[in-house]
Each structure stands twice: as C-alpha cells, then as structure tokens.
Swiss-Prot record:
GO BP, sorted A to Z: proteolysis
Post-translation changes: N-glycosylated.
Task performed by this protein: Carboxypeptidase which preferentially cleaves C-terminal acidic residues from peptides and proteins. Can also cleave C-terminal hydrophobic amino acids, with a preference for small residues over large residues.
SMART domains to which the protein is assigned, alphabetical: Zn_pept
Superkingdom assignment: Eukaryota
Required cofactor names: Zn(2+)
Gene designation per UniProt: cpo
Protein name: Carboxypeptidase O
Activity regulation description: Strongly inhibited by potato carboxypeptidase inhibitor, and the chelating agents EDTA and 1,10-phenanthroline. Also inhibited by compounds with multiple carboxylic acid groups such as citrate and succinate, and to a lesser exent the amino acids aspartate and glutamate. Not significantly inhibited by benzylsuccinic acid.
Length: 363
C-alpha cells in the first residue's frame, strides 16, 4: 500500500512538472536575460495574466498568415469608461530578437513596480498599455529553426505562383505613402512591400486595431534593432509630421535618459535623416491617422553584432531602452493629465518636506 501511494505521488508530481514545462516556467524562474521561443513567450503572456488578473488581460486582434492568433497584453487598472492608451509592439521583423526581449522586460518592470511606485501607479490609473511582444509570429518562429533561417526578416506568406521566394516586409506594408520610397517590388527582396498595401494579415490586424482605438491612443512605440536610433515620422524625405519639432524634443529627452543608464548614445531624427528613406511603416501610419506621438526605437548595437546581439547585452539594452520609453510615456501622460501630474508632484514634495522636518529635529 505504501509503495502504491509513493508511486501515485510520483506520477502526480511528474504530471505537474510536465504541465509546467508545457505551459512555461514559473514567473520567478523566467530568465529575462535569455532569448525565448514563441511557445515560451506565449506561455509567459498567459502567466502574466494569471499572476496579475487585476491589471492584465489578453486580447486577440487578428491572425498571422499561418493562422496563429496575434495577441497583446492590455495592462492598466480597469475602468468603466474608455481610457487613453499607449501602444507598443515588438518583433515586426523576425530576426530582431532583442525587440521581443524588450517588450517582456518592459512588462516585467511595470508590473513589478506599480504597487510601490506612485508614478507607475498613476500611469496605470490614467492609461492602458497595449503591448504585442511578437507581431510577426510566423517569421519569428521560422528564425528559430536553424542557423540558415536565423536572419529571416519578413513574414511567411507566399509570393506569386512563379516565384520560389516568400515573405513581405511588414514594415513596408502599411497604408502610409505605400510603395513610394525605400521598398522593392521584387518578392525576393528583404524590403518587398507586398502586392498591395495591407496585403498581409498582420499589418491589417494592427491597422484595424488602431482604427478602432485611434481616438484613445496617445502614443505609438514600435521596437526594432539595430542602430541605436529613435526615429520620428515620416520615412518619406519630403514629408514632415506637423508636430516634428515636439517629436524631436521628446525623442532627444528619451535619448538623454537612455545615455544616463549605461552611456550608450542614440541618434534622434526622421528615418531619411539618420537611417534611410522608407514608406509603408507602422510608425508613419500611426501618425497619419492622428496618433500624435509615434516613435521607432532601434535598439543596440551599432553593427558590431547586429541582429545577433549576445545574450549578455539583453539586460543592459532593455534597462536603457526602458528609461527611454518611460521618458516618452511620462511626457505624453503629463501633457494629457496635467492636474494629476501636479497633484502627484505636490504630494511627493509634501512627503519629502515632512521627512526633512522630522529628521532635522533629531539630535
């Protein structure tokens, strides 16, 4: 009987272990200093929701070409009325593994601090965060297959019948000066912009979501690599955003915040000015439909490792980029919620003064 009980317990423990492996490792053991497969990231997303049900929910807003659900994390305190929101997506280009790593880091940081950090708590009260850790899921999975696919960039949709090539550059497929500059009509090219604007279901899904929420979205952040850049609209050299000067000011402040962490310098400007002209980008589309603050982050490095950024650089890259992103988010928040920001600042100063007075009388 004793042997049977021990056997039963071992069976149960084995099943539990297998279930955890299938569903992803526990949050405490999730390694944010490593790159993760799509299955691991999906399990992590579910875990974030399970562990933080008061502030995290998942939303599926489309499917990839290979019929995978495109899912985001909605983060913030619940509200009976629609809230203003921040969008962040990572992994639109498959080979840029540091981008999904950053989205995960960002989520970890805000969820780990909103209960103790009054600033993040205020953001959660006034804003919702829509965060897609991997937009190009098909391409990302393909980039994990082997060394020959590691540098895959595009989606995985097929080209026309007479071509052996596949994939569209999703960041050339949005309806924003589509097909004008910085693209190719050759499907074998890495910057192939698709048969038509929004030919790709991934781009269409984002477009539909932004359209449905455009009156509430204040800021659009799309995370890429590499180059250490903060890019503002637009990718066309002859078109500037109406609030270009303000975007530059906000971007330069973010670059300053980034440099303060590990000393890394980020250039700020439009894509034609600091990188290359392009069209059909998600950043430009977001600005065109009226989302006032739209930025592309190109994370580390400057070409030493390129897309194969070593894992020992994940943490410092994410730490500095987090400060840059929060610099932008705080600016956007404070501009739209001035009274709230003043109240929090006053409360902070009152608390500091009280502490100073109390300690100044201690002899």
């Amino acid at each position: 009987m004793m042997q049977a009980s021990i056997t039963s317990i071992l069976v149960v423990l084995t099943l539990v272990a297998q279930d955890r492996l299938a569903g992803g490792l526990e949050h405490k053991s999730y390694d944010y200093t490593k790159y993760h497969t799509m299955d691991e990231i999906s399990a992590w997303m579910n875990q974030m929701q399970r562990e933080n049900p008061d502030v995290v929910s998942t939303m599926t807003y489309g499917q990839t070409y290979e019929k995978r659900n495109i899912t985001l994390l909605k983060i913030g305190f619940s509200s009976t009325t629609p809230k203003k929101a921040i969008w962040m997506d990572c992994g639109i280009h498959a080979r840029e593994w540091i981008a999904p790593a950053f989205c995960q880091h960002f989520v970890k940081e805000v969820l780990g601090s909103y209960k103790t950090d009054s600033r993040v708590n205020m953001l959660f009260k006034n804003l919702d965060f829509y965060i897609t850790p991997v937009l190009n899921m098909d391409g990302y999975i393909y980039s994990w297959l082997n060394n020959s696919t590691r540098l895959w960039r595009k989606s995985r949709s097929p080209c026309h019948e007479n071509s052996t090539c596949s994939g569209t550059d999703l960041n050339r497929n949005f309806y924003a000066n589509w097909g004008m500059v910085g693209i190719s009509r050759n499907c074998c090219s890495e910057v192939y912009n698709g048969a038509t604007a929004l030919s790709e279901p991934e781009a269409e899904a984002v477009t539909d979501f932004l359209g449905a929420h455009q009156n509430h979205l204040l800021c659009y952040l799309t995370i890429h690599s590499y180059g250490q850049l903060i890019l503002v609209p637009y990718g066309h050299p002859n078109i500037s955003a109406p609030n270009y000067d303000e975007l530059m000011e906000v971007g330069l402040a973010a670059a300053k915040a980034i440099k303060a962490v590990h000393g890394k310098s980020y250039k700020v400007g439009s894509s034609p000015d600091v990188l290359y002209p392009n069209s059909g980008s998600s950043r430009d589309f977001a600005r065109l439909i009226g989302i006032p603050y739209s930025f592309t982050f190109e994370l580390r490095d400057e070409g030493q490792h390129g897309f194969i950024l070593p894992e020992d650089q994940i943490q410092p890259t994410c730490q500095e980029a987090y400060e840059g992103a929060m610099s932008i988010i705080n600016y956007v928040h404070d501009k739209n919620f001035k009274n709230t920001a003043i109240t929090v600042t006053a409360t902070l100063w009152t608390t500091l003064m009280a502490l100073w007075i109390s300690t100044s009388h201690v002899f």
